[in-house]
């Protein structure tokens, strides 16, 4: 038997929308891990990250400004063993991007959780995907990676990041579920990829009146079984 883990990957639109709805969406999901894109990354980012985590009933594991707004949050069930942040090379005139990583343990199972948010510029994304993939490949535990890739499964950056990993939506036969935008869903640009040793039990893109108020992206909610290692 594996160890259950519930994960949410969520672009929260820099908390520009209904923050009460946002908190309610995450709390109702009862996740062990939340991978946030567009989290706090500027003035007082530590305090803002802690406040966001508290509103979700979670704690900050890694990320924030050092990861350019990628933020990893966990429940107290998850033990965080180590963390690191990554910054991708800057293209002049564009936004600086990066990734966050946390090595964790839950009920005797080790895993590495990672999050990133790639550029809206298709010329930048392939190189950023290579950097993110290097970070994922450096992990010594089974990886789960949540990202807003800003492109669909037919894109080159998506292909780079997903290589050797399982697309949770495909594994659950729900790749038809679109993640963006909440106003007019047309694209699946948000994904959760997992090590093949991790079992995808269930996958959902949560589309409700509340999630439509909370952000411009729908949250990706995935139930996993981790391989026990201890």
Which residues make up each language-model segment?
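N-terminal, active-site-proximal structural segment of metallo-dependent hydrolase catalytic domains
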Residues: 1-54, 70, 225-230
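Structured beta-strand-rich core segments of catalytic domains in phosphoester-bond hydrolases
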Residues: 2, 33, 38-110, 204
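Active-site metal-binding loops of divalent metal-dependent hydrolases
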Residues: 12, 39, 116-118, 147-149, ...
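Short, Asp-centered acidic motifs that coordinate Mg2+ and/or phosphate
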Residues: 32-33, 111, 142-144, 167, ...
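Active site of divalent-metal-dependent phosphoester/diester hydrolases
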Residues: 57-77, 91-95, 150-218
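Surface-exposed cleft-lining segments at the edges of enzyme active sites
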Residues: 86-90, 114-123
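A long, amphipathic alpha-helix that forms part
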Residues: 126-141
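Acidic/histidine-rich, metal-coordinating catalytic segments
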Residues: 141-153
């Amino acid at each position: 038997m594996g160890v259950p883990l519930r994960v949410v990957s969520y672009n929260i639109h820099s908390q520009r929308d209904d923050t009460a709805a946002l908190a309610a969406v995450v709390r109702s999901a009862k996740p062990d891990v939340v991978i946030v894109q567009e989290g706090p990354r500027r003035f007082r980012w530590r305090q803002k990250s802690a406040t966001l985590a508290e509103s979700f009933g979670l704690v900050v594991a890694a990320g924030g400004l050092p990861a350019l707004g990628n933020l990893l949050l966990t429940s107290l069930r998850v033990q965080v063993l180590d963390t690191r942040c990554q910054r991708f090379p800057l293209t002049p005139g564009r936004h600086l991007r990066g990734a966050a990583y946390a090595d964790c343990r839950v009920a005797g199972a080790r895993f590495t959780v990672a999050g990133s948010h790639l550029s809206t510029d298709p010329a930048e994304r392939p190189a950023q995907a290579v950097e993110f993939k290097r970070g994922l490949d450096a992990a010594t535990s089974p990886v789960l990676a949540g990202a807003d890739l800003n492109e669909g499964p037919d894109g080159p950056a998506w292909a780079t990041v997903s290589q050797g990993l399982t697309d949770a939506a495909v594994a659950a036969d729900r790749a038809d579920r679109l993640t963006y935008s909440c106003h007019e869903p047309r694209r699946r640009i948000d994904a959760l990829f997992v090590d093949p040793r991790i079992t995808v039990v269930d996958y959902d893109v949560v589309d409700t009146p509340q999630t439509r108020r909370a952000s411009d992206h729908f949250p990706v909610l995935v139930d996993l079984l981790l391989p026990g290692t201890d």
